[in-house]
Amino acid sequence: MQQLLNEILDEVRPLIGRGKVADYIPALAGVEPDQLGIAVYSRDGELFHAGDALRPFSIQSISKVFSLVQAIQHSGEDIWQRLGHEPSGQPFNSLVQLEFERGRPRNPFINAGALVICDINQSRFAAPAQSMRDFVRRLCGNPEVVSDSVVARSEYQHRSRNAAAAYLMKSFGNFHNDVEAVLLSYFHHCALRMSCVDLARAFCFLADKGFCKHSGEQVLNERQTKQVNAIMATSGLYDEAGNFAYRVGLPGKSGVGGGIIAVVPGRFTVCVWSPELNGAGNSLAGIAALEKLSERIGWSIF
């Protein structure tokens, strides 16, 4: 496995320079584009990694999975009264569909859906950002995971579109807390800094029927784990989820920080990171690396 990971990084490294680092978040625009890492973690605790897999980066929308899991833990099926679990087919920050569907987001992985989930969690936790940080630390076994306040502040200063989505949902009665407070929590979630190794470990409960070996806790039950993996498979890569299923064939979640996490149910998790994005906002070299790994090992849910 170690040799395979090294080979795959060598094969996809020439793609660096063909994508573009996220620049609509100023604090992310200065990230060095030539970084590339990959980590594989098995449900039995075996870890393999290559490249920049130990270097922390901004997880951005990958955090939406953690938020969703927290909401499922305390509210269960009730959360689906306020949002759906269908693919949107629209850009992750689109307002058009949200207006047409009267403030009910299609799924928890587009921005509007993630904001509803954060609104649900805001009603539950006295300090949502700290609760999320502590939850993630338990999942990955790394007590040094923190949120980058500079990135969070940068995102908050450029919050107009997310604020518009939140206020639109509030006008339809689907947003209950103070919009600015929820946005602050949301951006602190997105600004969490984790490495490929951290994320591969943190997501391993989704490969093990909801059980996290690091914390010894049953994070989700088996049915809930299946549901989260299903939403990742259909909606985890913005409006490129179909292409990702076609090329990689695994449940996954991406972020504009360049990270992608993928789950092989019953076996492994794998995280890749390369900051340069394609036109859909997903890591260009990251998708290529996952495609090669899936083909070489024969990992696919299809």
UniProtKB/Swiss-Prot annotation:
Q: Which UniProt keywords apply?
A: Hydrolase
The entry sums up its family as follows: Belongs to the glutaminase family.
Highest lineage ranks of the organism?
Bacteria, Pseudomonadati, Pseudomonadota, Gammaproteobacteria, Pseudomonadales
Cross-referenced SUPFAM superfamilies: beta-lactamase/transpeptidase-like
Entry annotated with the keyword Membrane: no
Among the Pfam families in the record, one is Glutaminase
Protein name per UniProt: Glutaminase
- What HAMAP family has UniProt attached to this entry? Glutaminase
Q: What class of enzyme is it?
A: hydrolase
Q: Which gene encodes it?
A: glsA
Q: At which positions is substrate bound? A: 61, 111, 155, 162, 186, 238, 256
Catalysis performed (reactions): L-glutamine + H2O = L-glutamate + NH4(+)
Instruction: Indicate the quaternary assembly.
Output: Homotetramer.
Enzyme Commission number(s) of this protein = 3.5.1.2
